């Protein structure tokens, strides 16, 4: 429940909003306001909980009353997002499923899941612009920027907690489709190789197989074979950064047009074959999970975009 005066807004925290940090809560209330400004008003004591000053890490409880001061920014949120209006509108066309608890979309390749690291626009920012009335929208999991496919978003904090629990307990099944170099051997049904993440000076993340890394496993199944490539279904058992991309490379079958782990000769073959492919061929094809509100087991599939379909058709015709 909210009450407002011309200068101050008082928000009563519901059970669904409880448990989150005050700084994260303010980001949902003050859309378009820079994080630096949010921390400044917290530091200066302009934000109060139950009439007391609080620190950014304070966790809200049901029944808390949050005093939010008026915040002026140089640009209104609508103006700030205007260069991306076409991308925002496009997100409406790729929503696969939505109810009061969750939203599932077919993320386009080339779009980051969230802004940051020099990116001003991501899926979550776009969804918040598309659904300005939504009090809560948070990513349940992530996809690499160049990976397309099923992306799950929680619309309630209780839904986010339930779905994160499923991820931790391996109760969520993800299936990806990847086009890899050469003939994947049918007997290779699983790759188990520990992965170690390195951060370069540029800030770029590179992952490699290392005994010092975290245990990682991906299961594989051949879907279709072509003259010099294989379409494989990849089901990660663990959820490490770049896991499928590094495991396929480790198995000797890197994914097409992977800007970090690819085989350039394989990419050249695909170009010369007239596939028209110019992006990472990794697509999150399906996601199976238990609905956080109803308990129903759901399996949502995301179709490949036309570019990936054309590529596969070219390879079929060339056999």
Q: What do the PLM-derived regions correspond to, one by one?
A:
Residues 1-319:
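RNA pseudouridine synthases
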């Amino acid at each position: 429940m909210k009450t407002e005066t011309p200068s101050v807004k008082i928000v009563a925290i519901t059970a669904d909003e409880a448990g989150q940090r005050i700084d994260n809560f303010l980001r949902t209330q003050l859309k378009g306001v820079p994080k630096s400004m949010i921390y400044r008003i917290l530091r200066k004591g302009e934000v109060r909980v139950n009439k007391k000053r609080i620190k950014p890490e304070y966790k809200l409880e049901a029944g808390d009353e949050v005093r939010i001061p008026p915040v002026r920014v140089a640009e209104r949120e609508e103006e700030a997002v205007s260069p991306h209006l076409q991308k925002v509108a496009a997100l409406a066309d790729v929503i696969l499923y939505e109810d009061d608890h969750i939203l599932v979309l077919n993320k386009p390749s080339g779009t980051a899941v969230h802004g940051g690291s020099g990116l001003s626009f991501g899926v979550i920012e776009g969804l918040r612009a598309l659904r300005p009335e939504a009090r809560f929208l948070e990513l349940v999991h992530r996809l690499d920027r160049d990976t397309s496919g099923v992306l799950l978003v929680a619309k309630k904090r209780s839904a986010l907690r339930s779905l994160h629990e499923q991820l931790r307990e391996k109760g969520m099944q993800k299936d990806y489709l990847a086009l890899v170099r050469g003939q994947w051997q049918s007997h290779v049904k699983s790759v188990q190789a520990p992965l170690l993440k390195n951060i370069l000076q540029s800030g770029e993340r590179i992952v490699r197989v290392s005994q010092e890394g975290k245990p990682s496993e991906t299961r594989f199944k051949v879907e279709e074979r072509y003259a010099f490539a294989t379409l494989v279904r990849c089901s990660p058992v663990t959820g490490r950064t770049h896991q499928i991309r590094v495991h396929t490379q480790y198995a000797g079958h890197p994914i097409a047009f992977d800007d970090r782990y690819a085989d350039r000769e394989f990419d050249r073959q695909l170009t010369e074959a007239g596939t028209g492919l110019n992006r990472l061929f990794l697509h999150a094809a399906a996601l199976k999970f238990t609905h956080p509100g109803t308990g129903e087991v759901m399996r949502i599939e995301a179709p490949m975009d036309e570019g990936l379909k054309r590529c596969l058709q070219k390879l079929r015709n060339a056999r």
